[in-house]
Amino acid sequence: MGRRKDLFFLLPLVIPLAPVMNPSRSLLSTPNRRIAAIAMLVLVVDQISKALVLQFLPNVWEEKTVVDGFFKVVHWQNTGAAWSSFTGKNGMLALIAIVALVILYFSRHHFNSHTLLGQFAFGLVIGGIMGNLVDRIVRQHVVDFIRFYIRLRGGNGEETGFPAFNIADSAICVGVTLVFLMTWRNEHAPKPVESPSE
């Protein structure tokens, strides 16, 4: 019941995306609608995946090995940012996320949003930020659960690997990478040769 009640915290984030649910127009009829639809999809998938982790791995630091020595599903709580930076600054990071969403919204036309790939990338970034923001508002921490690792030699059970992350983190990374690659391609694209005037 508590988890269902938590869903009400999604309303302030979902309401701005409501236009994409208007049945009188196509869901993907405009660039803004396509961006909003992708962001909504990322948000929903991210929150469902985290809810499943909390259901099947209810205890913090609990884990389930999927591929021994390579991949496991974990339940980690992160009150900071990537790589545990700014630990304990959940409120500040939530405020930064809100400011970032506002800035991104008003600067969306600078992110190649006129192209389908640009809209996809922008939607990934927006949805990823929203996914982790919901965590910070509802749970006061971000739930990380995807863990790739390798075992260290010595047989003492120690391991090393990439810090645990989630669907929202992945969406942000992929979106930012796509934006960077598109920007780089546009800057290095050959300029059209002007024909000499007669």
Language model features with spans:
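Alpha-helical transmembrane bundles and membrane-interface segments of multipass inner-membrane proteins
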Residues: 6-198
